């Protein structure tokens, strides 16, 4: 089975997207944005694009696949590797290559942060708080500041974390976040600022990161030109599924890694 034959099961538009810029001379393909609706085969197309890259000699260790769930990443890589394995078996080749970097933004961020931790001032052995643990820590800080006593209308821990997360991921000022999404909490802006500062300090003391920190630290380390270049040069191809769900922080991460867009493929649905 040839690389071209791998695309036979796709319709013309899917085939065009799966093959775009691959095999052309001049290095990594130009940036590609695929906009398609539900049920149009976006995942199938992206899986075939990964397979097509591998069959054209792309280094599997230099492909980065970013998704929004671990299950989506695993399924996409399973499909791509099955396609490649079938093609290689038909040609009498050996074991198919394995894509080494695939997962959610948070999982990939955690992996990179552990590698770069000594350079950026993080403890490489940092622990990761899930949402429940983050809420509990925020609630402890809230209590220490006296914001949980005698303030019946002060936001509960889940709401506080939602406000904090929105501000971090959207990269918007707290006042704007409150006005746009939590107007009933606007009267507590000063107290929330104090709470969030203390929450950040508590995480630093305990050497823990919450999910938002995984993106925030990743984005911040890429503000250093040398680090951004090193991380960006590590990957020839960056493929992003469900791009319409990316937030400002995630978009900034991709842009800082690949400022020219070289080798970037983004797939999304503009109706969602």
Cite the ranges covered by each PLM segment.
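Conserved helicase NTPase motor core
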Residues: 3, 8-35, 45, 64-65, ...
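ATP-binding Walker
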Residues: 40-41
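Generic alpha-helical structural context detector
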Residues: 19, 107-110, 114, 162-166, ...
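Coupling/switch/interface segments within P-loop NTPase motor domains and analogous charged loops
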Residues: 131-203
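Walker A/P-loop NTP-binding motif
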Residues: 44-59, 79-82, 255-260
């Amino acid at each position: 089975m040839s690389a071209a034959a791998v695309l036979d099961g796709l319709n013309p538009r899917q085939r065009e997207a799966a093959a775009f810029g691959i095999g052309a001379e001049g290095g990594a393909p130009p940036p590609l944005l695929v906009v398609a609706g539900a049920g149009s085969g976006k995942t199938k197309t992206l899986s075939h694009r990964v397979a097509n890259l591998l069959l054209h000699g792309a280094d599997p260790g230099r492909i980065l696949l970013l998704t929004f769930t671990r299950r989506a990443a695993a399924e996409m890589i399973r499909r791509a590797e099955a396609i490649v394995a079938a093609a290689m078996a038909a040609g009498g080749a050996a074991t198919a290559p394995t894509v080494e970097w695939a997962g959610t933004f948070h999982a990939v961020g955690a992996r990179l942060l552990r590698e770069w931790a000594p350079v950026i001032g993080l403890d490489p052995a940092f622990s990761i708080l899930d949402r429940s643990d983050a809420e509990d820590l925020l609630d402890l800080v809230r209590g220490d500041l006296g914001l949980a006593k005698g303030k019946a209308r002060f936001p509960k821990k889940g709401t506080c974390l939602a406000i904090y997360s929105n501000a971090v991921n959207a990269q918007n000022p707290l006042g704007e976040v409150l006005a746009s999404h939590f107007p009933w909490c606007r009267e507590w802006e000063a107290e929330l600022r104090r709470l969030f500062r203390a929450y950040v300090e508590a995480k630093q003391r305990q050497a823990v990161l919450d999910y938002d920190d995984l993106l925030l630290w990743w984005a911040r380390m890429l503000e250093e030109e040398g680090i951004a270049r090193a991380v960006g040069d590590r990957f020839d191809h960056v493929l992003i599924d469900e791009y319409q769900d990316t937030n400002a922080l995630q978009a900034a991460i991709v842009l800082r890694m690949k400022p020219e867009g070289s080798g970037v493929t983004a797939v999304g649905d503009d109706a969602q």
